[in-house]
Amino acid sequence: DMKNVDTRGLVLFSRHYREQDKLVKIFTERFGKRMFFVKNAGKSRFASSLQNFTQLELLGTINDDGLSFISDISEAKPYQFINSDIFAQAYASYLVGLSDVALPDNHYDAPLYGFLMKSLDLIEEKIDMVVVTFIFELQVMSRFGAQLDFGQCVFCHRKDLPMDFSYKFNGC
């Protein structure tokens, strides 16, 4: 099933496909992560817009069963600081990678998309990237089957005593 859509997205990565073409993975706000086919990518008018860590407003064809296609990009905003600072790039790559594995392809998840974008915005604004990353990890860890328990003792399950947090046992 193919549909023409207008959506925001973030370029997660791209890779060469055949001689001239590219496959570009974009986390879209409205349709989840999608793989887009870009023919003659080097000569494409979209080439500069399809770099990693670039926010897009795109018009395209979303295909539920295979590759999707871009017909136009009305806005492309690269993260300048993230792309120029090796540490910011490393943290941003880690957040993008976590988001990629936290969500199956083609699954809609606007909250995760928004949270990733906000986290990248904060890194771009030079907010402490270690803190931003730690908060991001805490928020998405439940998607991997892990969670912290602050509500009770993880051994005796009492709630009426002062507690101390244990990293070893992921709880109080």
Positions of PLM-derived features:
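Non-catalytic alpha-helical scaffolds and adjoining flexible linkers that form interface surfaces
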Residues: 1-172
